Amino acid sequence: MVSLRDNIEAQPLSHNRRIRKNFGHINLVADIPNLIEIQKNSYEKNFLQLNIKDSERKNKGLQSILNSIFPISDSSNIANLEFVKYEFDTPKYDVEECSQRSLSYAAPLKVTLRLSIWDIDEDTGTREIKGIKEQEVYMGDIPLMTKNGTFIINGTERVVVSQMHRSPGVFFYHDEGKVHSSGKLLYSARVIPYRGSWLDLEFDAKDVIYFRIDRKRKLYITTLLRAIGMSTEEIIKFYYNSVTYKLVKNKGWAVKFIPQHITAHRLTSDLVDADTGNILLKAGQKITPRLAKKYFGEGLNNILVAHETLIGKYLSEDLRDPTSDEVLAKIGEMITADMLNVINALKIKNVNVLVINPQSGPYIRNTLFADKNQDREAALCDIFRVLRPGEPANIEAAESLFYNLFFDVDRYDLSEVGRIKMNSRLELNISEEVTVLTIDDIKNIVRVLVELKDGKGIIDDIDHLGNRRVRSVGELIENQFRIGLVRMEKSVIERMSAGDVDTVMPHDLVNSKILVSVVKEFFNTSQLSQFMDQTNPLSEITHKRRLSALGPGGLSRDRAGFEVRDVHPTHYGRICPIETPEGQNIGLINSMATYARINKHGFIESPYRRVKDGCVTDEVVYLSAIEEGKYKIGQANSKVNKDGKLQGEFINCRVEGGNFVMVEPYEVDFIDVTPMQVVSVAASLIPFLENDDANRALMGSNMQRQAVPLIKTDAPFVGTGVEGVVAKDSGASVLALHDGIVEQVDSNRIVIRTLEQKVDGSPSVDIYNLLKFQKSNHNTCINQKPLVKVGHYVKKNDIIADGPSTDNGEIALGRNVLVAFLPWNGYNFEDSILISERIVKEDVFTSIHIEEFEVIARDTRLGPEEITRDIPNVSEEALRHLDEVGIIYIGAEVKAGDILVGKVTPKSESPITPEEKLLRAIFGEKAFDVKDSSLHVPSGVSGTVVEVRVFSRRGVEKDQRAIAIEKQQIEKLAKDRDDELEIIEHFVFSWLEKLLVGQVIINGPKQVKVGQTITTEMLKGLSKGQFWQITVEDANVMNEIEQIKTHYDEKKEALDKRFATKVEKLQSGDDLPQGALKVVKVFIATKHKLQPGDKMAGRHGNKGVISRIVPEEDMPFLEDGTVVDIVLNPLGLPSRMNIGQILETHLGWASINLAKKISTLVKEYKNKHIGIEQIKKFLIELYGENINSILERPEEEIISFCKKVSKGVHFATPVFDGAKVQDVKDMLKLAGQDPSGQVKLIDGRTGEYFDRLVTVGQKYLLKLHHLVDNKIHSRSIGPYSLVTQQPLGGKSHFGGQRFGEMECWALQAYGAAYTLQEMLTVKSDDVNGRIKTYDSIVRGENNFESGIPESFNVMIKEFRSLCLNVKLEVTSS
């Protein structure tokens, strides 16, 4: 077999990768996990379980819901509908087709159901199966996720944001002393299920314990304990220990000595050993717990106490008369002086009492005696009355209600997570399958609550990430599915009961519309299903990794306090402490940290390296916030020697509660994987983040998401090394699916012959159609450019094409520009930015924005609307851009007001003139009465038409334009098919040739003779089809040729079939909305050059607006004549404390000067002044070890590498592990510059040096999506508000402004009465005055009369609404 690697002539694509000088010291052991896997895993793996065989599906997601809802039985148990399996059909349209046709990308869900019908014998009640029907039922279209983790809903790309909510389980709190005036802590507990009723337990100020269900009226806790079946005795025995007082004649009582119950106090009586009679301590002496332990250790077991000590104690069992066995006092009663006399009189020798001491209070005993309910029935009825007030309480209803509340699987679900949390908090060992409350749970919740009150244990921290979990896409949609299926279940039962069950099939019972509407509603209207932020690739990734505390079942903005929004120690490595919105959502919407992932229970995990005996291993362990609390964790920058041993006497470690301790190396359990794991993706792209103030870093990471993709992309010279990962995972770039060799490349597509051979040995072909000038959700431009050349060898997952805002496989949100920090004539006051004309001239910050305009031709009452060029009363000039159908040409330059698509709408019949009557009589036809309803370019838009799409309803004849577009698309598909076939044919026939050459012919076409030996020349004379006609002697070769032929035919047939399906889809017409005959979409691309008023920003939160564009000759310049591009205000730094931008500027200055040095060396090498060794030496000095792979290559490749860095050397300074100030100075020295990073600068206007040295360097700046073109507008004539008759406000309403309050003061100050009157009446909201003034201007007169402004009438109406009848009476003077 031929090895395809024989013809790899060209270099591998990996040779083109950008190499950065990396300042990081910490070796990365773990790669950054795929940045969008949180979405894909949750939906595809956990919810849909796509591509998994039915038998291997786990009971989770869709499978678990279907299992829990089915089987469904009717009321009489005759019919039973069971679930067998489910599967998905292939979607009708692919992602691209759905985007273009405004459809949802979804796959039909087919569920196999089995309907069993039973026969029930009325006499005996025995059941026999009467019949079984199994059928596949269509359950609606379920949205599928695209490969980038998004959904296409009605043609737009949407993202479902993950939600942070409180984990199910039990939580204990106190009120922090806020409720009671004394500041006493009132403890409470709350059981939060995944779904079901909430149970609250609470102490009141009198230390009585109550409970509430769903925040209704409170009841005594003992009512709940009785309701779960506990008697008084069981309650007391469960919560209290008992101690026995034994009578000692004439001395008192002997009781067991328990040192744990002793607190420090002065004795009121002697401490006497009951066994020996020795006095250990005299009355008035002090006893302490330590002393008590000492006595206990020395053998003190029982002590003697006085007779009256029993008074005030509580009985731990019924007190009975020893002779008659009569109950004298009930369990739990307090011993009084009278009762003690009875005990003495009856000579009762042993009395059992409850152990109640300073460490444990009598709360439950007191509650028991306050509660009037004495048995289970009374307790259940009491609960029933609270939950169902007004309904008569009987025991059956009460029992059923109570059972349904907490113990019914269908109505109450703690979820597996809730059960795990419950078990760990209450120290129980109940199976994880039990997801309802148990009696043990309730008993132990009360126990823990009482212990907390007694000072044992600590309350829970709600903001701890062990108590908050993430609900991702899969789980959110799972909950919607459950709602839909429960609704459907009701309709199935109704249909079962209504119809004749014997004749019914499963599909007759199931109404899929119920399910579909619930899912649709979620995707279209849920607060968590959001329009994807598609400004640039970073904003897409960030949106998919966002965690929101808002949404259904979450918090609301108004009620969220400071604690929820604050950074918590457990956020470390899980949630980014920097990236969150400014404003009212601060802290409620967060971003996942770079290395974080979500475990199967929904808790966020962070990776750590294991440390064994003080030695750091490469084993990476992911820990959740709960697990992390058990260990001591060191920082990533702890010093480690070559053998991996931690150095230093003590290591700084994090322990539970976010505290830091110093421990010895062998005590350390884990260390961080990398310092970058603390921050999110956006923050990890900011170099020198460690030198910036947190507030500015927050702005920096937020503004990177608003950067507009530029025409010319440029990766930052000073990066952090994460740029490549972001570009790859964002889906903006195109990745190779398999190893292969590039066969064809143009700007629209890449064809790669793969090297992964199939069973038959023939290659498959990957064709990548690139996106050209597509509109994103935010009207920015998506355009992909190939990075490969023909003959390149690519590996799987190599980046083969750049997308928007990417450059050579790295994210490139802005441009590197030469910046000087200096004041310039006040034009950089208040963060304004001064830019050179070169930036505009060379399109440095020019971006393309694409607007979409749509026109629909509908079928109206009066007849169909028509798309046509034939529009009444429109000049030929206005139609110049339209084709014969009335649709604009691609490439036409349009401005506001131009017609894009001509459309006419039928008008209602108007009375006809005699002339028209005559015409109709002569020509015998009705003159078509239509009005112009064409699509015009709206105000403020101009540009070039880049694409037109025409959609026609099925069955409506297509116009010429639609046919032309269709033909173009079919040609494109045919070319893809032909190219793929050509590559396969080339391979197959070259293989055939190798098999045939040298073989002897038995039979063949006319051109060959039998018995000849085949040569290459002989085969050249044959056509491809004749190869198959040759028969040779060797049977093995013939077998192989047969196999090749079969595989070749199969492949050809598959290709033809795929092509035919796609063509059929194109030709079949479209599913358009109700009443629409034709839809035309026109896309206009606009080039936005940089102009004053546009907002720009750096990566450190330094933002500003362009104030002026200055000619190059007036800008400051360097001594070598280089003109500075941008001048920034040095005062923007000190107070903002984002020093990172200065370090970036210095390192950027080193970058371009090192590049100049390399270029000089290359020139000298070409002129033969130096050898390649000197260049190698300099590169090693600059790059260190990173460069070894390049230096091993041939000389030409080293020189070609040097040319690539001729504009600037690329650095990577990872977050918290990057270049220090000394490293920057070293680089400046290596570049031959002053280590201060400052230079002499010359004023372009005067030609003189500035007085002081100026900081100059390369800085990375972004153009933000706040363009002045989209903000400024002017109004001439426009709409008025109905109530006030004043212009509307805002650009979207084409609004204006009226003369305001302060403007009135200005005219009043000048006493300009008539001007003021004019401004407030005819020029504002005096409607009649306006009309009259207009008339007089038309007539050429100059006089006008002012009336009453409408706002005055509004004021009078408002007075009247307050019952004040104000009238305006005009009296003549």
UniProtKB/Swiss-Prot annotation:
UniProt superkingdom: Bacteria
Segments forming a coiled coil: none
PROSITE patterns recorded: RNA_POL_BETA
Function: DNA-dependent RNA polymerase catalyzes the transcription of DNA into RNA using the four ribonucleoside triphosphates as substrates.
Family: Belongs to the RNA polymerase beta chain family.
Subunit structure: The RNAP catalytic core consists of 2 alpha, 1 beta, 1 beta' and 1 omega subunit. When a sigma factor is associated with the core the holoenzyme is formed, which can initiate transcription.
NCBIfam families the UniProt entry points to: PRK00405.1 (NF001616), rpoB (TIGR02013)
Protein name: DNA-directed RNA polymerase subunit beta
Source organism of this protein record: Rickettsia massiliae
Source organism phylogeny: Bacteria, Pseudomonadati, Pseudomonadota, Alphaproteobacteria, Rickettsiales
